[in-house]
A protein has these predicted regions:
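Membrane-interface amphipathic segments in extracytoplasmic regions
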Residues: 1-185
């Protein structure tokens, strides 16, 4: 039986670790493995020019409001120099890259907090985080159970925002809202 060849574009904070774990244990699919973690599609295309068109590509996108709360708690979990003991979410939103993401080795502001549309192109199939199991089953044409890994523990994302921070995130990620049909709050 031929394995289906896949390229997974791992946008940060969109269940990528769970996806990779799923494919490590599935013999029906061949995931292109020479990729760096969180590599955007234009690099993948450039570095795999001979194989690129032989693979089915996909990425997962997430509601930007939810993704940013998840990023905040991820950075908080890293406990960067006790930074998060002093900065509240709505304060951090004003300029998140001015703060912790510059302090993490190997993690830049363009990675963790970059708009999702920058990771993909028109050749990439988009699955939504909010309906991931269902969309993944449809995309793979196979019933799979996605493991939950790296989940941050926090309240519903809307509990963290005020009107000003909702507006900041909408304008910062406006293209993601439009391209992936997420609603402005």
């Amino acid at each position: 039986m031929n394995k289906e060849k896949l390229i997974f574009i791992h946008i940060p904070k969109t269940a990528g670790t769970s996806i990779k774990k799923l494919f490590l244990n599935d013999n029906d699919f061949s995931l292109l493995t020479n990729l760096k973690k969180h590599e955007p599609i234009y690099n993948i295309k450039k570095n795999n020019i001979n194989d690129y068109n032989k693979y089915k590509k996909f990425a997962i996108v997430r509601n930007p409001y939810d993704r940013i709360v998840s990023s905040y708690f991820f950075l908080q979990k890293m406990n960067i120099k006790n930074f998060f003991q002093t900065i509240e979410f709505n304060e951090w939103i004003k300029n998140p890259c001015k703060h912790p993401c510059k302090l993490l080795p190997g993690l830049t502001k363009y990675l963790l907090l970059a708009p999702q549309y920058l990771w993909i192109d028109e050749t990439v199939n988009i699955l939504k985080y909010e309906n991931l199991n269902k969309e993944l089953n449809t995309f793979l044409n196979k019933k799979v159970n996605l493991p939950k890994i790296n989940n941050s523990i926090h309240e519903h994302y809307l509990n963290y925002y005020n009107n000003k921070s909702l507006n900041i995130i909408y304008h910062r990620y406006k293209e993601d809202f439009k391209k992936f049909n997420y609603k402005k709050l």
